[in-house]
From Swiss-Prot:
UniProt protein name: Glutamate-1-semialdehyde 2,1-aminomutase
Any Pfam family the entry gives: Aminotran_3
Record PTM N6-(pyridoxal phosphate)lysine, positions in chain: 273
One annotated Gene Ontology cellular component of this protein: cytoplasm
Isomerase is among the record's keywords: yes
InterPro entries (UniProt xref): 4pyrrol_synth_GluAld_NH2Trfase, Aminotrans_3, Aminotrans_3_PPA_site, PyrdxlP-dep_Trfase, PyrdxlP-dep_Trfase_major, PyrdxlP-dep_Trfase_small
Species lineage: Bacteria, Bacillati, Cyanobacteriota, Cyanophyceae, Synechococcales
Species whose genome carries this gene: Synechococcus sp. (strain ATCC 27144 / PCC 6301 / SAUG 1402/1)
Length: 433
């Protein structure tokens, strides 16, 4: 156990109570409120390496990693030092910055699909822009997204997936007009036949297909054998674009993302998280002929006050430099496999149905027999059991994503001893569930 003993959250509770009077739900992003797992959220005070400390002094082994960016560990000294130097020159220019060229070259060299790139300030912004670009390039309005794949909170992506009504493009949030999502078609993840049917029903109208090539926002779901290849074939057949949302998986699954790992090259890619080294960032890129449509080179407008700011560029450059060191992804795969395999083995030994897996430094598991191929399968997980497991692990000093439907992340800062401690905690908690 790595928390203070006994486990107390008095200060966290006080701060969150005050926050609820100041911000909707007391948070700046919904999942942080612990609504999915119950109880009060933990308020962090600081993070370092693979650990987080809350305001009550409890220390946690962190498997959220600020939702993915902290692949080198929190507050890596080389990133911090680079930021200190950059800040002396100013926090934002609102003008061209030489650091943009450096990070752009690194991204282009790494990601197979990207010949040109545009930096923005978040993954949501990147996906908003890439959707506009898909439509501008093809002259078509409709897109296909997959049930359970998250592409940010922009109106056109907020479509409830998985039912016949949802396929008609009805909005999944108040305030989103039906007309906004009318051209957003949905299909179950890992279902090529459903994708073929949508193209057949909408001949010459679909601009393209966008997806998380490995799903991290319905829990952790990998593509079936041939699924990504099948999407590439279908989109080429219909002169439509294939877009990989690699905001979460880019530079995490491999240096070149899922597209490098699985050998399937899309037309466009969105990025975020890791390429900002923990600072707000996003990017989209792809074939030169498509990207030349983006203003000011072309007529498709997109802009941003803080886009390409020197701090995000600096943190991103240093993070990618660290990731290029030898054996980086081999180590991530090694420790994450040991963690994932261990969790599943402990679940089986303690009598709990569970399934899951990992790829590189990304993992997840469900309290269900499985296998899980899509969001409908994921929803079979025992959410009450997960809530109890989450709370138990929290009290044992292990910080997991406060939702069954979020992937977990390891970092280069996690040690074999951290994995040992995590598995020991899991055995204690699962034995008592």
């Amino acid at each position: 156990m790595v928390t203070s003993s006994p486990f107390k959250t008095i200060k966290s509770d006080e701060i969150f109570a005050a926050a609820q009077k100041l911000m909707p739900g007391g948070v700046s992003s919904p999942v942080r409120a612990f609504k999915s797992v119950g109880g009060q959220p933990i308020v962090f005070d600081r993070v370092k390496d693979a650990y987080a400390w809350d305001v009550d002094g409890n220390r946690y082994i962190d498997y959220v990693g600020t939702w993915g960016p902290a692949i080198c560990g929190h507050a890596h000294p080389e990133v911090i030092e680079a930021l200190k130097v950059a800040m002396e020159k100013g926090t934002s220019f609102g003008a061209p910055c030489a650091l943009e060229n450096v990070l752009a070259e690194m991204v282009i060299d790494a990601v197979p699909s990207i010949e040109m790139v545009r930096f923005v300030n978040s993954g949501t912004e990147a996906c908003m822009a890439v959707l506009r670009l898909m439509r501008a390039y093809t002259g078509r309005d409709k897109i296909i997204k997959f049930e359970g794949c998250y592409h940010g909170h922009a109106d056109m992506f907020l479509v409830k997936a998985g039912s016949g009504v949802a396929t008609l493009g009805l909005p999944d949030s108040p305030g989103v007009p039906k007309s906004t999502t009318a051209n957003t078609l949905t299909a179950p993840y890992n279902d090529l036949e459903a994708v073929k049917a949508l193209f057949a029903e909408n001949p010459g109208e679909i601009a393209g297909v966008i997806l998380e090539p490995i799903v991290g926002n319905s829990g952790f779901i990998v593509p079936d054998a041939g699924f990504l290849e099948g999407l590439r074939e279908i989109t080429l057949e219909h002169d439509a674009l294939l877009v990989f949302d690699e905001v979460m998986t880019g530079f995490r699954i491999a240096y070149g993302g899922v597209q490098e790992k699985f050998g399937v090259t899309p037309d466009l890619t969105t990025l975020g998280k890791i390429i900002g080294g923990g600072l707000p960032v996003g990017a989209y890129g792809g074939k030169r002929e498509i990207m030349q449509l983006v203003a000011p080179a072309g007529p498709m407008y997109q802009a941003g006050t803080l886009s390409g700011n020197p701090l995000a560029m600096t943190a991103g450059i240093k993070t990618l430099e660290l990731l290029r060191q030898p054996a980086t992804y081999e180590y991530l795969d090694q420790i994450t496999k040991r963690l994932s395999d261990g969790l599943l083995a402990i679940a089986q030994e303690t009598g709990h149905a569970a399934c899951g897996g990992q790829v590189s430094g990304m993992f997840g598991f469900f309290f269900t027999e499985g296998p899980v191929h899509n969001y409908e399968d994921a929803k079979k997980s025992d959410l009450q059991k997960f809530s109890r497991f989450h709370r138990g692990m929290l009290e044992q000093g292990i910080y997991l994503a406060p939702s069954q439907f979020e992937a977990g992340f390891t970092s280069l800062a996690h040690t074999e001893e951290d994995i040992d401690a995590t598995l020991a905690a899991a055995r204690t908690v699962m034995s008592a569930l």
